[in-house]
Amino acid sequence: MDACFSTQLIDGDGVFNVSGLENFMKEVKMGECGLSYAVVSIMGPQSSGKSTLLNHLFRTNFREMDAFKGRSQTTKGIWMAKAHNIEPCTLVMDLEGTDGRERGEDDTAFEKQSALFALAVSDIVLINMWCHDIGREQAANKPLLKTVFQVMMRLFSPRKTTLLFVIRDKSKTPLENLEPILREDIQKIWDGVPKPHAHKETPLSEFFNVEVVALSSYEEKEELFKEQVASLRDRFQQSIAPGGLAGDRRGVVPASGFSFSSQQFWKVIKENKDLDLPAHKVMVATVRCEEIGNEKIASFTADEEWQQFEEAVQHDYVPGFGKKISNLLDRCLSEYDMEAIYFDEGVRTSKRHQLESKLLQLVNPAYQNILDHLRTRTLEVFKESFDKSLEKEGFAVAARDCTKVFLEKFDKGSEDAAIQQVKWDPSKIKDKLKRDIEAHVASVRAKKLSELCSKYEGQLTKALAEPVEALLDSASEETWPAIRKLLQRETKSAVSGFESAMASFELDEVTQKELLSKLESHGKSVVESKAKEEAARVLIRMKDRFSTLFSRDADSMPRVWTGKEDIKAITKTARSASMKLLSTMAAIRLDEDGDNIENTLSLALVDTARPGTTDRSIQSFDPLASSSWERVPEEKTLITPVQCKSLWRQFKAETEYTVTQAIAAQEANKRNNNWLPPPWALAAMAILGFNEFMTLLKNPLYLGVIFVVFLVGKAMWVQLDIAKEFQNGFLPAVLSLSTKFVPTIMNILKRLADEGQRPAAPERQREMELQPKSTRNGSHSNVTSAGSSSITSSESGPEYSSPIAH
């Protein structure tokens, strides 16, 4: 009997025992029953043996009346227990007896409330009645039946309740005779009960299945009573099966919602409101399905496998995420379906959708993390693969192929992460990946193009810089045409190579033109940069050119100022060349547009030295008094006219010293070469020495002596090379001649003595003897032997050689 878990459901004051019912539900494991359960309640007069009948019929342990202590109220309120060894699970409710003296005749409220509650929750209602009351007008069961029928009008139930009339203390009258009388009495009571207008003509059979059973007296025929009860017990086995006592299962509340349903029933009954069982069924289903859904959400959140997934997706991509999460969701929803299967379908489905939506809300952040990790991983692998592809393929082909491959990989990865229960669209993440890939491709393209541009710009710079510098250094009329030709040739070569290298990028025409134009502009900028550099050094270049032309002759040999050179003409030529260099460097001439810079500079700077030019310059407008050149744009101007004028003034000032030094050197050379007395001295000598001159002419001896002296002097002049010695200065010449004078005199005298002692010989033999000596001694009369001397002849006269010991 202990397995019946007897519990007071509602006490005598009408207070519902919520905690007691919850414990009872757990003890009997009602949550596992679903719709496979039945509720049986019993009504009847007080002390009519209701509890005794239930205890024998269902083997419960309800408190029974002790006949030896007198008849009094035993059951207060409503009690509940579980029938023992009856399938399906059967709940038994023992109601407080009617017409008890404890409540009095006027207190029928609780009777009606408990009756209504029993009809609302029960599948089978046992009406316990005395056999001797059948057919009596004032029978004890009539008020009870009236109460049952009256409260039934307040129940809007779609199902029929089974009323099982249990006739107690059966007499000798057969049941076949008693049953028609009982049914007739029941019909009369039904007809006499006030009904709503909609049910004025509704027969009793629409609301109840009436069954009648008779039992012998428990006190007088206990064994027979027990046999009859055992037979009746068999009818409660599988009572919910079709044809059973509780065969009509329409509107039944699932077992898991029984507790809440009972509470709500009693609450509405206590508020004296009509019970709309269909609406109540929906309400119970709504609350219970909501509870089941919340339980499943809590269960899903606490699931260890889900927590592991949730943690894993925070850090990296998880393969098979979609399938695994789908299985978890399926399991959770299946559990919900199993627990909520017996509730109202509409409510169940609605709450299932809500549960699914909430579960998906829980899963969505993890799904988004998976896609983000997939996008990040795909992008990283794309970058590596793209870099490798660039080593084998052209840029555009590699970018196109890699983009296609990795977008397809993302699609496969997103399919792997897809959850079966929902069709989340990964297109936004894919679009972001596509934008990231395009941004990376654009970045690499820009980098590669920049490297390519730098490469060809470097080549162009290398091809132009030094040649342009050399051409600008030469600074002639052909300088800028040569630079233009060089620029055109090298730019064309660079553009051709750059264009071929760009082909793999498959750039649009506009971009190609921009890059090619940039390369062409770079070539011009190199030339312009070099021109500006050279323009900054133009003064140095001008001085170098002037120095080169002024200090060196046409054969690039150092110029010696002997006195015969035209320094003025040389200076003008050198300055004109420097002026041409200045005019060349004054402007950038990459276009073939003509200008008059050279003419302007020539007129303003060089031609001012001509007679009459100075006066005209003073009277007319200065062409260099301007900040720009005629027909030359400002951006092409390297040196303005005013700057040219200033540079020329500085140039002249810094080269004036060189010219002055040349003039001084020429004058000094002239002085050194002029060893004759001044003309006035010669005139004085002629006047004052006229008498002596006439004496010499009149005396032949003097003339002979003078002739000999002339020959000796001539020989000394040639032998000592006096003219050359004096070119080195007066004092050095005197010192050099003083050391050579005596040896030379001795050499000459010795040679004359030798010549006088030799016999006369033919002239030809003499020439042959003298020729080797002349060749051996050389044009500078170098010493060949310490004790020999010879006399040679040349075109300029006899030449004497004197040996000098080395």
UniProtKB/Swiss-Prot annotation:
<keyword id="KW-0812">Transmembrane</keyword>
<dbReference type="GO" id="GO:0016320">
    <property type="term" value="P:endoplasmic reticulum membrane fusion"/>
</dbReference>
<keyword id="KW-0378">Hydrolase</keyword>
<feature type="compositionally biased region" description="Polar residues">
    <location>
        <begin position="772"/>
        <end position="783"/>
    </location>
</feature>
<feature type="coiled-coil region">
    <location>
        <begin position="446"/>
        <end position="466"/>
    </location>
</feature>
<dbReference type="GO" id="GO:0005525">
    <property type="term" value="F:GTP binding"/>
</dbReference>
<feature type="transmembrane region" description="Helical">
    <location>
        <begin position="677"/>
        <end position="697"/>
    </location>
</feature>
<dbReference type="InterPro" id="IPR027417">
    <property type="entry name" value="P-loop_NTPase"/>
</dbReference>
<protein>
    <recommendedName>
        <fullName>Protein ROOT HAIR DEFECTIVE 3</fullName>
        <ecNumber>3.6.5.-</ecNumber>
    </recommendedName>
</protein>
<dbReference type="GO" id="GO:0005783">
    <property type="term" value="C:endoplasmic reticulum"/>
</dbReference>
<comment type="similarity">
    <text>Belongs to the TRAFAC class dynamin-like GTPase superfamily. GB1/RHD3 GTPase family. RHD3 subfamily.</text>
</comment>
<keyword id="KW-0342">GTP-binding</keyword>
<feature type="compositionally biased region" description="Basic and acidic residues">
    <location>
        <begin position="756"/>
        <end position="770"/>
    </location>
</feature>
<feature type="topological domain" description="Lumenal">
    <location>
        <begin position="698"/>
        <end position="700"/>
    </location>
</feature>
<keyword id="KW-0256">Endoplasmic reticulum</keyword>
<dbReference type="InterPro" id="IPR046758">
    <property type="entry name" value="Sey1/RHD3-like_3HB"/>
</dbReference>
<feature type="transmembrane region" description="Helical">
    <location>
        <begin position="701"/>
        <end position="721"/>
    </location>
</feature>
<keyword id="KW-1133">Transmembrane helix</keyword>
<dbReference type="Pfam" id="PF20428">
    <property type="entry name" value="Sey1_3HB"/>
</dbReference>
<feature type="region of interest" description="Disordered">
    <location>
        <begin position="756"/>
        <end position="806"/>
    </location>
</feature>
<feature type="compositionally biased region" description="Low complexity">
    <location>
        <begin position="784"/>
        <end position="806"/>
    </location>
</feature>
<feature type="topological domain" description="Cytoplasmic">
    <location>
        <begin position="722"/>
        <end position="806"/>
    </location>
</feature>
<dbReference type="InterPro" id="IPR030386">
    <property type="entry name" value="G_GB1_RHD3_dom"/>
</dbReference>
<dbReference type="Pfam" id="PF05879">
    <property type="entry name" value="RHD3_GTPase"/>
</dbReference>
<dbReference type="GO" id="GO:0005789">
    <property type="term" value="C:endoplasmic reticulum membrane"/>
</dbReference>
<keyword id="KW-0175">Coiled coil</keyword>
<feature type="coiled-coil region">
    <location>
        <begin position="214"/>
        <end position="239"/>
    </location>
</feature>
<dbReference type="InterPro" id="IPR008803">
    <property type="entry name" value="RHD3/Sey1"/>
</dbReference>
<feature type="domain" description="GB1/RHD3-type G">
    <location>
        <begin position="34"/>
        <end position="249"/>
    </location>
</feature>
<keyword id="KW-0547">Nucleotide-binding</keyword>
<feature type="topological domain" description="Cytoplasmic">
    <location>
        <begin position="1"/>
        <end position="676"/>
    </location>
</feature>
<comment type="function">
    <text>Probable GTP-binding protein that may be involved in cell development.</text>
</comment>
<dbReference type="GO" id="GO:0003924">
    <property type="term" value="F:GTPase activity"/>
</dbReference>
<keyword id="KW-0472">Membrane</keyword>
<feature type="binding site">
    <location>
        <begin position="44"/>
        <end position="51"/>
    </location>
    <ligand>
        <name>GTP</name>
    </ligand>
</feature>
